[in-house]
UniProtKB/Swiss-Prot annotation:
NCBIfam families: tig (TIGR00115). This is Trigger factor. HAMAP family: Trigger_factor_Tig (MF_00303). It comes from Nitrosococcus oceani (strain ATCC 19707 / BCRC 17464 / JCM 30415 / NCIMB 11848 / C-107). GO terms for molecular function: peptidyl-prolyl cis-trans isomerase activity; protein folding chaperone; ribosome binding.
Length: 443
Protein backbone atom coordinates (compact mmCIF):
# COMPACT_ATOMS: atom_id res chain seq x y z
CA UNK A 1 0.00 0.00 0.00
CA UNK A 2 1.32 3.41 -1.00
CA UNK A 3 0.18 6.50 0.90
CA UNK A 4 0.90 10.12 0.09
CA UNK A 5 -0.17 12.89 2.45
CA UNK A 6 -0.79 16.45 1.31
CA UNK A 7 -1.50 19.32 3.73
CA UNK A 8 -4.24 21.33 2.00
CA UNK A 9 -4.91 23.56 5.01
CA UNK A 10 -3.82 24.12 8.60
CA UNK A 11 -5.78 21.06 9.69
CA UNK A 12 -6.98 19.65 6.36
CA UNK A 13 -5.19 16.65 4.88
CA UNK A 14 -5.58 14.91 1.54
CA UNK A 15 -4.50 11.28 1.33
CA UNK A 16 -3.93 9.36 -1.87
CA UNK A 17 -3.97 5.64 -1.17
CA UNK A 18 -2.89 3.14 -3.81
CA UNK A 19 -3.27 -0.64 -3.62
CA UNK A 20 -2.27 -3.28 -6.19
CA UNK A 21 -5.10 -3.76 -8.66
CA UNK A 22 -4.33 -7.48 -8.69
CA UNK A 23 -5.22 -7.73 -4.99
CA UNK A 24 -8.56 -6.11 -5.64
CA UNK A 25 -9.35 -8.29 -8.66
CA UNK A 26 -8.36 -11.45 -6.76
CA UNK A 27 -10.69 -10.53 -3.91
CA UNK A 28 -13.56 -9.86 -6.33
CA UNK A 29 -13.05 -13.22 -8.05
CA UNK A 30 -12.77 -15.01 -4.71
CA UNK A 31 -16.06 -13.45 -3.55
CA UNK A 32 -17.84 -14.35 -6.80
CA UNK A 33 -16.58 -17.96 -6.75
CA UNK A 34 -17.76 -18.34 -3.14
CA UNK A 35 -21.24 -17.35 -4.33
CA UNK A 36 -21.51 -19.95 -7.11
CA UNK A 37 -22.64 -22.90 -4.90
CA UNK A 38 -25.42 -20.77 -3.41
CA UNK A 39 -26.79 -19.19 -6.59
CA UNK A 40 -30.14 -20.37 -7.95
CA UNK A 41 -30.99 -19.30 -11.49
CA UNK A 42 -33.59 -20.42 -14.02
CA UNK A 43 -32.14 -22.82 -16.58
CA UNK A 44 -29.39 -24.11 -14.30
CA UNK A 45 -29.26 -26.71 -11.56
CA UNK A 46 -28.71 -25.29 -8.03
CA UNK A 47 -25.00 -24.64 -7.51
CA UNK A 48 -24.18 -25.27 -11.18
CA UNK A 49 -24.49 -21.75 -12.57
CA UNK A 50 -21.32 -20.98 -14.61
CA UNK A 51 -18.89 -18.52 -13.11
CA UNK A 52 -19.13 -16.21 -16.14
CA UNK A 53 -22.91 -16.00 -15.74
CA UNK A 54 -22.55 -15.21 -12.02
CA UNK A 55 -19.94 -12.58 -12.82
CA UNK A 56 -22.16 -10.98 -15.45
CA UNK A 57 -25.16 -10.88 -13.09
CA UNK A 58 -23.49 -9.97 -9.79
CA UNK A 59 -20.05 -8.64 -10.75
CA UNK A 60 -20.89 -4.93 -10.46
CA UNK A 61 -22.45 -5.26 -7.00
CA UNK A 62 -19.61 -7.44 -5.72
CA UNK A 63 -16.97 -5.04 -7.06
CA UNK A 64 -18.67 -2.18 -5.18
CA UNK A 65 -18.91 -4.28 -2.01
CA UNK A 66 -15.23 -5.25 -2.14
CA UNK A 67 -14.29 -1.66 -3.00
CA UNK A 68 -16.04 -0.39 0.13
CA UNK A 69 -14.17 -2.95 2.23
CA UNK A 70 -10.82 -2.04 0.66
CA UNK A 71 -11.42 1.67 1.31
CA UNK A 72 -12.51 1.10 4.90
CA UNK A 73 -9.59 -1.19 5.79
CA UNK A 74 -6.88 0.68 3.87
CA UNK A 75 -7.95 4.08 5.22
CA UNK A 76 -7.78 2.72 8.76
CA UNK A 77 -4.30 1.31 8.09
CA UNK A 78 -3.14 4.50 6.34
CA UNK A 79 -4.03 6.90 9.17
CA UNK A 80 -2.35 4.53 11.60
CA UNK A 81 0.74 4.33 9.40
CA UNK A 82 0.93 8.13 9.05
CA UNK A 83 -0.01 8.80 12.72
CA UNK A 84 -2.99 10.94 11.73
CA UNK A 85 -5.99 11.67 13.97
CA UNK A 86 -9.04 12.44 11.81
CA UNK A 87 -11.66 14.88 13.04
CA UNK A 88 -15.13 14.41 11.65
CA UNK A 89 -16.23 12.35 8.65
CA UNK A 90 -13.73 11.97 5.77
CA UNK A 91 -14.73 12.90 2.22
CA UNK A 92 -13.86 9.99 -0.05
CA UNK A 93 -13.54 10.34 -3.81
CA UNK A 94 -14.71 7.00 -5.30
CA UNK A 95 -11.84 4.80 -6.48
CA UNK A 96 -11.43 3.88 -10.13
CA UNK A 97 -12.53 0.28 -10.60
CA UNK A 98 -11.20 -0.40 -14.10
CA UNK A 99 -9.95 -3.98 -14.38
CA UNK A 100 -6.20 -4.43 -14.36
CA UNK A 101 -5.36 -0.99 -12.99
CA UNK A 102 -4.21 0.02 -9.52
CA UNK A 103 -6.88 0.46 -6.89
CA UNK A 104 -6.39 4.14 -6.00
CA UNK A 105 -8.54 6.73 -4.29
CA UNK A 106 -8.23 10.01 -2.43
CA UNK A 107 -9.73 11.02 0.87
CA UNK A 108 -9.89 14.50 2.40
CA UNK A 109 -10.42 15.17 6.09
CA UNK A 110 -9.44 17.40 8.97
CA UNK A 111 -7.10 16.26 11.71
CA UNK A 112 -7.24 17.09 15.39
CA UNK A 113 -4.85 19.89 16.36
CA UNK A 114 -1.68 18.86 18.15
CA UNK A 115 -1.69 20.17 21.72
CA UNK A 116 1.72 19.28 23.12
CA UNK A 117 0.81 20.28 26.66
CA UNK A 118 -1.98 22.18 28.36
CA UNK A 119 -0.79 25.56 29.63
CA UNK A 120 -2.01 26.77 33.01
CA UNK A 121 -0.08 30.05 33.24
CA UNK A 122 -2.12 33.01 34.39
CA UNK A 123 -5.08 30.99 35.63
CA UNK A 124 -6.29 32.26 39.00
CA UNK A 125 -9.40 30.89 40.63
CA UNK A 126 -11.59 32.85 43.02
CA UNK A 127 -13.20 30.18 45.17
CA UNK A 128 -16.38 31.38 46.90
CA UNK A 129 -16.52 31.06 50.67
CA UNK A 130 -20.06 31.26 51.99
CA UNK A 131 -22.39 29.67 54.49
CA UNK A 132 -26.13 29.33 54.97
CA UNK A 133 -27.24 31.88 57.58
CA UNK A 134 -30.47 32.20 59.57
CA UNK A 135 -31.33 35.17 57.36
CA UNK A 136 -31.00 32.97 54.27
CA UNK A 137 -33.31 30.38 55.82
CA UNK A 138 -35.85 33.08 56.70
CA UNK A 139 -35.75 34.23 53.08
CA UNK A 140 -36.62 30.74 51.85
CA UNK A 141 -39.42 30.44 54.41
CA UNK A 142 -40.79 33.75 53.16
CA UNK A 143 -40.78 32.49 49.57
CA UNK A 144 -42.51 29.27 50.67
CA UNK A 145 -45.19 31.36 52.37
CA UNK A 146 -45.69 33.37 49.18
CA UNK A 147 -45.97 30.17 47.15
CA UNK A 148 -48.76 28.99 49.46
CA UNK A 149 -50.69 32.25 49.72
CA UNK A 150 -54.31 31.86 50.76
CA UNK A 151 -56.83 34.17 49.09
CA UNK A 152 -59.42 35.60 51.46
CA UNK A 153 -62.73 36.94 50.00
CA UNK A 154 -63.20 40.69 50.47
CA UNK A 155 -66.36 42.82 50.44
CA UNK A 156 -64.39 46.02 49.82
CA UNK A 157 -63.13 47.60 46.56
CA UNK A 158 -60.15 45.89 44.91
CA UNK A 159 -56.74 47.39 45.57
CA UNK A 160 -53.11 46.80 44.59
CA UNK A 161 -51.95 43.20 45.24
CA UNK A 162 -55.53 41.88 45.46
CA UNK A 163 -56.61 38.90 43.40
CA UNK A 164 -59.62 39.60 41.20
CA UNK A 165 -61.58 36.90 39.37
CA UNK A 166 -63.42 38.19 36.31
CA UNK A 167 -65.24 37.14 33.19
CA UNK A 168 -64.60 39.37 30.20
CA UNK A 169 -65.53 39.66 26.54
CA UNK A 170 -63.46 41.82 24.22
CA UNK A 171 -64.26 43.22 20.81
CA UNK A 172 -62.61 45.37 18.17
CA UNK A 173 -64.94 47.55 16.10
CA UNK A 174 -67.84 45.56 17.53
CA UNK A 175 -66.45 42.15 16.56
CA UNK A 176 -64.98 39.50 18.93
CA UNK A 177 -61.31 38.64 18.38
CA UNK A 178 -59.33 35.45 19.12
CA UNK A 179 -58.27 35.28 22.77
CA UNK A 180 -60.45 38.26 23.65
CA UNK A 181 -62.82 36.42 25.99
CA UNK A 182 -62.18 34.48 29.22
CA UNK A 183 -64.33 32.92 31.94
CA UNK A 184 -63.26 33.05 35.60
CA UNK A 185 -59.95 34.72 34.80
CA UNK A 186 -57.81 35.35 37.91
CA UNK A 187 -55.48 38.35 37.91
CA UNK A 188 -53.29 39.75 40.70
CA UNK A 189 -53.41 43.53 40.47
CA UNK A 190 -50.00 45.11 40.08
CA UNK A 191 -48.28 41.83 39.26
CA UNK A 192 -47.93 42.74 35.59
CA UNK A 193 -49.34 39.48 34.21
CA UNK A 194 -51.85 41.40 32.08
CA UNK A 195 -51.71 44.74 30.28
CA UNK A 196 -51.21 47.62 32.71
CA UNK A 197 -54.06 49.64 31.19
CA UNK A 198 -56.40 46.66 31.60
CA UNK A 199 -55.42 46.22 35.28
CA UNK A 200 -55.89 49.91 36.04
CA UNK A 201 -59.59 49.62 35.20
CA UNK A 202 -59.92 46.87 37.84
CA UNK A 203 -58.58 48.98 40.73
CA UNK A 204 -61.57 49.89 42.91
CA UNK A 205 -64.05 47.36 41.51
CA UNK A 206 -66.36 45.39 43.78
CA UNK A 207 -67.65 41.83 43.72
CA UNK A 208 -70.62 41.54 41.33
CA UNK A 209 -69.84 44.80 39.54
CA UNK A 210 -70.15 45.00 35.76
CA UNK A 211 -68.20 47.53 33.74
CA UNK A 212 -67.17 48.38 30.20
CA UNK A 213 -63.94 50.10 29.19
CA UNK A 214 -61.58 50.57 26.28
CA UNK A 215 -57.84 49.98 26.04
CA UNK A 216 -55.31 50.35 23.24
CA UNK A 217 -52.93 47.46 22.64
CA UNK A 218 -49.24 48.56 22.61
CA UNK A 219 -47.59 49.10 19.23
CA UNK A 220 -45.13 46.29 20.02
CA UNK A 221 -47.72 43.87 21.42
CA UNK A 222 -46.79 40.21 20.97
CA UNK A 223 -49.80 39.50 18.75
CA UNK A 224 -49.17 41.73 15.73
CA UNK A 225 -52.80 41.43 14.62
CA UNK A 226 -53.81 43.32 17.78
CA UNK A 227 -50.83 45.70 18.05
CA UNK A 228 -51.89 49.35 18.14
CA UNK A 229 -55.60 48.58 17.95
CA UNK A 230 -58.32 49.87 20.30
CA UNK A 231 -60.46 47.21 21.99
CA UNK A 232 -63.59 47.38 24.11
CA UNK A 233 -64.08 45.01 27.07
CA UNK A 234 -67.24 44.07 28.95
CA UNK A 235 -66.19 42.79 32.37
CA UNK A 236 -68.06 41.14 35.24
CA UNK A 237 -66.29 40.89 38.62
CA UNK A 238 -66.81 37.44 40.14
CA UNK A 239 -64.80 37.99 43.32
CA UNK A 240 -62.26 40.22 45.06
CA UNK A 241 -59.74 38.47 47.31
CA UNK A 242 -56.82 39.61 49.43
CA UNK A 243 -53.60 37.65 49.89
CA UNK A 244 -52.93 36.14 53.29
CA UNK A 245 -49.62 34.53 54.11
CA UNK A 246 -49.99 31.24 55.99
CA UNK A 247 -48.51 31.08 59.46
CA UNK A 248 -45.23 29.23 59.82
CA UNK A 249 -46.36 26.52 62.21
CA UNK A 250 -46.62 22.74 62.45
CA UNK A 251 -49.52 22.62 59.97
CA UNK A 252 -47.47 24.60 57.46
CA UNK A 253 -44.52 22.22 57.93
CA UNK A 254 -46.78 19.20 57.37
CA UNK A 255 -48.17 20.78 54.22
CA UNK A 256 -44.57 20.91 52.94
CA UNK A 257 -44.03 17.22 53.67
CA UNK A 258 -42.39 17.43 57.11
CA UNK A 259 -44.41 14.92 59.12
CA UNK A 260 -42.45 15.10 62.37
CA UNK A 261 -40.48 17.76 64.19
CA UNK A 262 -42.58 20.73 63.14
CA UNK A 263 -40.98 24.07 62.24
CA UNK A 264 -37.57 23.11 63.69
CA UNK A 265 -37.38 20.06 61.41
CA UNK A 266 -38.56 22.18 58.47
CA UNK A 267 -35.73 24.65 59.09
CA UNK A 268 -33.23 21.79 59.25
CA UNK A 269 -34.45 20.39 55.93
CA UNK A 270 -34.30 23.82 54.35
CA UNK A 271 -30.74 24.36 55.62
CA UNK A 272 -29.63 20.92 54.39
CA UNK A 273 -31.11 21.58 50.95
CA UNK A 274 -29.59 25.07 50.78
CA UNK A 275 -26.20 23.69 51.83
CA UNK A 276 -26.32 21.16 48.99
CA UNK A 277 -27.28 23.91 46.56
CA UNK A 278 -24.47 26.10 47.86
CA UNK A 279 -21.85 23.36 47.49
CA UNK A 280 -23.01 22.65 43.93
CA UNK A 281 -23.01 26.36 43.07
CA UNK A 282 -19.43 26.70 44.38
CA UNK A 283 -18.35 23.74 42.23
CA UNK A 284 -20.10 25.22 39.20
CA UNK A 285 -18.43 28.63 39.68
CA UNK A 286 -14.98 27.07 40.07
CA UNK A 287 -15.62 24.83 37.06
CA UNK A 288 -16.61 27.78 34.86
CA UNK A 289 -13.55 29.78 35.92
CA UNK A 290 -11.25 26.86 35.15
CA UNK A 291 -12.83 26.34 31.75
CA UNK A 292 -12.59 30.04 30.92
CA UNK A 293 -8.95 30.07 32.05
CA UNK A 294 -8.05 26.98 30.01
CA UNK A 295 -9.59 28.48 26.88
CA UNK A 296 -7.67 31.75 27.28
CA UNK A 297 -4.37 30.01 28.04
CA UNK A 298 -4.69 27.43 25.25
CA UNK A 299 -5.95 29.05 22.02
CA UNK A 300 -6.01 26.56 19.17
CA UNK A 301 -7.35 26.18 15.65
CA UNK A 302 -10.52 24.10 15.69
CA UNK A 303 -11.62 21.58 13.05
CA UNK A 304 -14.49 23.15 11.12
CA UNK A 305 -16.18 19.76 10.80
CA UNK A 306 -16.36 19.28 14.58
CA UNK A 307 -17.73 22.79 15.13
CA UNK A 308 -20.41 22.20 12.49
CA UNK A 309 -21.29 18.86 14.04
CA UNK A 310 -21.58 20.38 17.53
CA UNK A 311 -23.63 23.30 16.19
CA UNK A 312 -26.08 20.83 14.65
CA UNK A 313 -26.40 19.03 17.99
CA UNK A 314 -27.15 22.29 19.83
CA UNK A 315 -29.65 23.30 17.16
CA UNK A 316 -31.43 19.95 17.47
CA UNK A 317 -31.54 20.29 21.26
CA UNK A 318 -33.12 23.73 20.88
CA UNK A 319 -35.77 22.30 18.55
CA UNK A 320 -36.53 19.50 21.02
CA UNK A 321 -36.92 22.05 23.82
CA UNK A 322 -39.36 24.03 21.69
CA UNK A 323 -41.33 20.87 20.97
CA UNK A 324 -41.62 20.17 24.71
CA UNK A 325 -43.12 23.66 25.10
CA UNK A 326 -45.75 22.87 22.48
CA UNK A 327 -44.05 24.74 19.63
CA UNK A 328 -43.77 22.94 16.29
CA UNK A 329 -40.08 23.35 15.25
CA UNK A 330 -41.13 22.85 11.62
CA UNK A 331 -43.14 26.06 11.73
CA UNK A 332 -40.19 28.27 12.67
CA UNK A 333 -36.74 28.76 11.20
CA UNK A 334 -34.00 28.66 13.81
CA UNK A 335 -30.83 30.58 12.99
CA UNK A 336 -27.79 28.48 13.82
CA UNK A 337 -25.41 31.45 14.21
CA UNK A 338 -26.19 31.98 17.95
CA UNK A 339 -25.10 28.39 18.60
CA UNK A 340 -21.75 28.56 16.80
CA UNK A 341 -19.78 30.22 19.62
CA UNK A 342 -21.13 27.76 22.17
CA UNK A 343 -20.20 24.93 19.80
CA UNK A 344 -16.65 26.30 19.43
CA UNK A 345 -16.32 26.49 23.22
CA UNK A 346 -17.45 22.88 23.61
CA UNK A 347 -15.11 21.57 20.93
CA UNK A 348 -12.12 23.50 22.30
CA UNK A 349 -12.73 22.28 25.86
CA UNK A 350 -13.16 18.71 24.65
CA UNK A 351 -9.75 18.87 22.95
CA UNK A 352 -8.09 20.42 26.01
CA UNK A 353 -9.69 17.92 28.39
CA UNK A 354 -8.70 15.04 26.12
CA UNK A 355 -5.08 16.23 26.20
CA UNK A 356 -5.10 16.46 30.01
CA UNK A 357 -6.55 12.94 30.28
CA UNK A 358 -3.85 11.61 27.95
CA UNK A 359 -0.85 13.49 29.37
CA UNK A 360 -1.81 12.98 33.03
CA UNK A 361 -3.04 9.41 32.43
CA UNK A 362 -6.29 10.14 34.25
CA UNK A 363 -8.72 7.22 34.36
CA UNK A 364 -12.26 7.23 35.68
CA UNK A 365 -12.13 6.50 39.42
CA UNK A 366 -14.45 3.52 39.99
CA UNK A 367 -15.14 4.46 43.60
CA UNK A 368 -16.17 7.96 42.52
CA UNK A 369 -18.41 6.49 39.83
CA UNK A 370 -20.19 4.34 42.41
CA UNK A 371 -20.45 7.34 44.74
CA UNK A 372 -21.94 9.47 41.97
CA UNK A 373 -24.53 6.81 41.12
CA UNK A 374 -25.41 6.50 44.81
CA UNK A 375 -25.90 10.28 45.06
CA UNK A 376 -28.17 10.30 42.02
CA UNK A 377 -30.09 7.25 43.24
CA UNK A 378 -30.83 8.87 46.61
CA UNK A 379 -33.52 11.08 45.05
CA UNK A 380 -35.43 8.09 43.63
CA UNK A 381 -38.10 6.02 45.35
CA UNK A 382 -36.12 2.81 44.76
CA UNK A 383 -32.39 3.71 44.83
CA UNK A 384 -31.25 0.12 44.24
CA UNK A 385 -33.42 -0.23 41.14
CA UNK A 386 -32.04 3.06 39.78
CA UNK A 387 -28.45 1.91 40.39
CA UNK A 388 -29.09 -1.36 38.56
CA UNK A 389 -30.64 0.60 35.70
CA UNK A 390 -27.49 2.74 35.37
CA UNK A 391 -24.97 -0.11 35.58
CA UNK A 392 -26.97 -2.31 33.17
CA UNK A 393 -26.56 0.09 30.25
CA UNK A 394 -23.14 0.96 28.82
CA UNK A 395 -24.29 4.27 27.35
CA UNK A 396 -25.88 5.49 30.59
CA UNK A 397 -22.85 4.42 32.61
CA UNK A 398 -20.57 6.15 30.10
CA UNK A 399 -22.32 9.46 30.83
CA UNK A 400 -21.56 9.02 34.54
CA UNK A 401 -17.94 8.09 33.78
CA UNK A 402 -17.48 11.19 31.60
CA UNK A 403 -18.91 13.42 34.34
CA UNK A 404 -16.58 11.84 36.92
CA UNK A 405 -13.53 12.25 34.66
CA UNK A 406 -14.43 15.89 34.08
CA UNK A 407 -14.53 16.37 37.86
CA UNK A 408 -11.13 14.68 38.13
CA UNK A 409 -9.74 17.03 35.47
CA UNK A 410 -11.13 20.06 37.31
CA UNK A 411 -9.60 18.79 40.57
CA UNK A 412 -6.23 18.28 38.85
CA UNK A 413 -6.22 21.82 37.44
CA UNK A 414 -7.29 23.18 40.82
CA UNK A 415 -4.21 21.58 42.39
CA UNK A 416 -1.92 23.26 39.83
CA UNK A 417 -3.19 26.85 39.83
CA UNK A 418 -3.45 29.71 42.29
CA UNK A 419 -6.68 29.62 44.30
CA UNK A 420 -7.90 32.70 46.16
CA UNK A 421 -10.74 32.60 48.67
CA UNK A 422 -13.54 35.07 48.06
CA UNK A 423 -16.08 35.82 50.79
CA UNK A 424 -19.61 35.89 49.41
CA UNK A 425 -23.17 35.57 50.62
CA UNK A 426 -25.34 32.56 49.86
CA UNK A 427 -27.42 34.58 47.39
CA UNK A 428 -24.34 35.89 45.58
CA UNK A 429 -23.04 32.35 45.07
CA UNK A 430 -26.26 30.67 43.93
CA UNK A 431 -27.46 33.64 41.84
CA UNK A 432 -24.61 34.70 39.50
CA UNK A 433 -26.65 37.70 38.31
CA UNK A 434 -26.51 39.23 41.80
CA UNK A 435 -22.74 38.87 42.20
CA UNK A 436 -22.19 40.07 38.61
CA UNK A 437 -24.21 43.22 39.27
CA UNK A 438 -22.34 43.79 42.54
CA UNK A 439 -18.96 43.44 40.81
CA UNK A 440 -20.01 46.00 38.17
CA UNK A 441 -20.98 48.47 40.89
CA UNK A 442 -17.65 47.94 42.67
CA UNK A 443 -15.77 48.42 39.40
Amino acid sequence: MQVTVEATGELERRLTITLPGSDFESKVQERLRSMVPRIKMDGFRPGKVPYKVVERRYGSAVRQEVSDEFVRDSFRDAIKQESLRPAGMPQIEPPQLEAGESFAYTVTFEVLPEIESVKLEGIKIKQPRAEVTDKDIEGVLKKLQEQHIEWEPMERPAQEADGVTITYHGSIEGKPFPGGSKENFFVILGKGTTLKEFEEHLIGVNKGQELTFEITFPEHYGNQELAGKKASFAVKVISVTAPRLPEINEDFAEKLGVKEGGVAALRQEIKASMTRNLEQAVRDRVREQIMDGLLVANPTTLPISLVKEETSILLEQAKNNLAKQGVNPQEISLDESPFVEQARRRVALRLIFSTILEKQEIKADQDKIKQRVTELAASYEDPEEFSRWIFSDRERLSEIENAVMETQIIDWVLDQVEVLDKSMSFEEVVNPQISSAKEKVQD
